[in-house]
Amino acid sequence: CIRRSWPIEAFETLIDLIAPNLYAYRDRFFTSFAATFEMFGKAGLIAFVVGLFFGVLLVVTRKGGVRENLLVYQVVNIVINVFRSIPFIILLIFLIPLTRAVVGSAIGVKGAILPLVFGTVPFYTRQVEVALAGVNEGKVEAARSMGSGTLGLIFRVYLHEAVPELIRVTTVTAISLIGLTTMAGAVGAGGIGSFAINYGQNQNHQDIVNVCVVVLLIVVFILQSLGNALARRTTNRGLF
């Protein structure tokens, strides 16, 4: 048989000492951890693209925008407000029929992606809108006077100038999405949230709950640190 590397063995020994109940379910824990990041990765990528699109759309179609269209702005604005006002746990239940129709299942990782996207996109859209709205209008007007079209203004002015702030709001959204994935676990999506409930709280294994909390805190700390580092780099030296 293939011998496992010493870091893995050392980690498992440490877990056995500080969290014996978790050690007994270690395989399930690692599977749940992987499921959480699968949900985070897939839903996050979709939400990033869709949220960025709608955030840009709101900025360019608002009153005084480069492509003012109040009808489009109001429709998108209302839809975003409606979905932002729905608590995520209610949104999960509300979207069950749509999730089944689209992906064929409302449970498991596959069934969690769509609700996570619906729960994240409105929040991220607003964050992007605020970030882009902070771009100096003088630079926008200067680019327009030089003949830049709508796409040129979007990519060369709005998105380029707002890179540091976009990184910050993306970091905030990513951290929020981690929280949503744990909530999704409460209704059968799997992941760390489901593991903490089923193997921790329901079986009165507090050490399992404690380790899950610590793991999530570490993940959040890493995301925040990376986001801060990238934002500082783009602000001070320019990543692009």
Specify the residue positions occupied by each region the protein language model found:
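Periplasmic/extracellular loop-to-transmembrane helix junction in inner-membrane transport proteins
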Residues: 7-43, 69-74
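Transmembrane alpha-helix signature in integral membrane proteins
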Residues: 29-60, 170
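Transmembrane alpha-helices
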Residues: 150-181
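Cytoplasmic-entry segments and transmembrane alpha-helices of multi-pass inner-membrane transporters
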Residues: 57-94, 116, 121, 127-130
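Short helix-to-coil transition segments within interhelical loops
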Residues: 132-162, 202
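C-terminal transmembrane helix and the adjacent membrane-cytosol boundary/short C-terminal tail
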Residues: 57-63, 209-240
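Loop-to-helix entry region at the N-terminal start of transmembrane alpha-helices
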Residues: 31, 35-39, 84, 88-123, ...
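Non-cytoplasmic
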Residues: 169-218
